[in-house]
Regions:
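N-terminal presequence-like segments and the immediate start of the first folded domain
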Residues: 10-112, 119-124, 129-132, 142-223
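Bacterial N-terminal signal peptides that target proteins for export
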Residues: 1-12
Length: 223
């Protein structure tokens, strides 16, 4: 085993119809053929009970993969000017488009986007727990010099990577500057992910656009 492999844990994501879980899988077992092949194998950092993302994800040759298009937020906040970043605040979470203390527009748009992705996946017989890869594009809000990565990451933790891998307990997640609380959706999945700032996004007012890949549970495929 090389030094890099020694510093990582190979965790096989078992993807049943009802969700996903992580289990340890040693290379010795795999070489001996004592363990069945897995659809997805995530490489997670050693010593971290609650990592945000995987270091990498391996997809088995037999896996059926669903890829979403780039998804931005819906214009749900009719109280804000059309085409403004505030018009894309998720009113299902923030009544009237009013943001609590510390919640940023990027954070609110991120929640909006991840709800849409969840609905997209569920229409295909999938869920957020089946997501293996995520690509995130952020624009900076008007009057700021840099994309709001912290706000995006808070939104992300509301739907992903919010369980303790050692105990299985739900991890509490902050929203804005509020005290950490139960996430909007409990999900142990840690996809591989990139997040980067772009010069602009295709729709006026969008600060967040996301696309994901998800693997169908064993024995299932596109509808």
């Amino acid at each position: 085993m090389n030094k890099r492999a020694a510093r990582t844990v190979l965790a096989a994501l078992v993807l049943p119809v009802v969700g996903a879980s992580t289990v340890a899988c040693s290379s010795t077992d795999a070489e001996a053929g004592s363990a069945p092949p897995v659809l997805v194998q995530s490489v997670l950092p050693v010593g971290e009970a609650n990592p945000m993302i995987a270091e990498g994800v391996g997809i088995g040759a037999s896996a059926a993969v669903y890829k979403t298009s780039g998804t931005g937020p819906s214009a749900a906040n009719t109280a804000a000017p059309q085409g403004s970043p505030e018009s894309y605040i998720d009113t299902a979470t923030f009544a009237g488009g009013v943001l609590p203390a510390g919640v940023t527009v990027t954070e609110a748009q991120g929640i909006n986007v991840l709800r849409k992705i969840r609905d997209n996946l569920e229409a295909q017989g999938l869920g957020l727990a089946d997501v293996t890869t995520m690509r995130v594009f952020l624009d900076n809000a008007p009057g700021t010099d840099r994309a709001d990565y912290a706000g995006w990451n808070r939104a992300y933790r509301q739907f992903f990577a919010n369980t303790n891998l050692e105990t299985g307990d739900t991890e509490l997640v902050p929203m804005g500057t509020a005290e950490p609380a139960a996430p909007l959706e409990r999900n142990p999945a840690r996809p591989n992910r990139f997040a980067l700032e772009v010069a602009s996004l295709p729709v006026a007012g969008w600060l967040v656009e996301v696309e994901v890949d998800a693997v169908y549970p064993e024995g299932k495929g596109p509808r």
